[in-house]
Regions:
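Active-site-adjacent "lid/gating" segments in soluble enzymes
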Residues: 1-103, 107
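Aromatic-enriched alpha-helical interface/lid elements that frame and gate functional surfaces
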Residues: 91-166
């Protein structure tokens, strides 16, 4: 189902093969959709006295899980592709190396990016090529290289602690 729905085409490293998600997401999400459908049907029955027919398929749900990527395609015309741990629309939103391991960054807006830059005493947020998320998207590789050079001097716990301050 992950392959037929397109989910595998957007999962994995950019230069790698399509990959399955590490857990049975299609089965899990279908179960969750079923619970929601049953709750809605029970509510409808309580209100109208009429029962409902619920019809779910693994493929429909697997396809629904690609909604954000589908929206990107429908609004830009650009087919989604694998980005590894990078977010397709937000930078930095990825795994980075630290002195003793890795952490996942999720810097979701320009204010957070300014605060994040200050952890490293960097003026990245003041540079036009990094000051806004659209600019960071265009200059993703350059920025991620700068970030990675700096995160490697922190332990994971120290960097997480610094990030949690903002």
């Amino acid at each position: 189902m992950q392959g037929m729905s397109g989910l595998m085409s957007i999962t994995g490293e950019p230069e790698g093969q399509p990959q399955k998600v590490g857990v049975a997401v299609t089965d899990i999400f279908t179960g969750l959709y079923a619970v929601i459908a049953v709750q809605a049907a029970l509510r409808s029955r309580d209100t109208t006295g009429i029962g409902q027919h619920i019809d779910l398929s693994l493929l429909d749900v697997a396809t629904a899980t690609t909604a954000n990527q589908a929206m990107n395609y429908l609004t830009t015309g650009i087919s989604p592709n694998r980005k590894g741990n990078n977010h397709p629309n937000i930078v930095p939103y990825c795994a980075v190396s630290t002195k003793d391991g890795h952490i996942i960054l999720a810097v979701g807006n320009d204010n957070q990016f300014e605060n994040f830059s200050k952890i490293f005493d960097a003026d990245w947020y003041q540079k036009d090529k990094f000051s806004t998320n659209p600019a960071r998207l265009k200059n993703r590789d350059e920025l991620l290289n700068l970030i990675e050079k700096n995160t490697r001097s922190f332990s994971s716990l120290t960097l997480l602690s610094e990030c949690e301050k903002f």
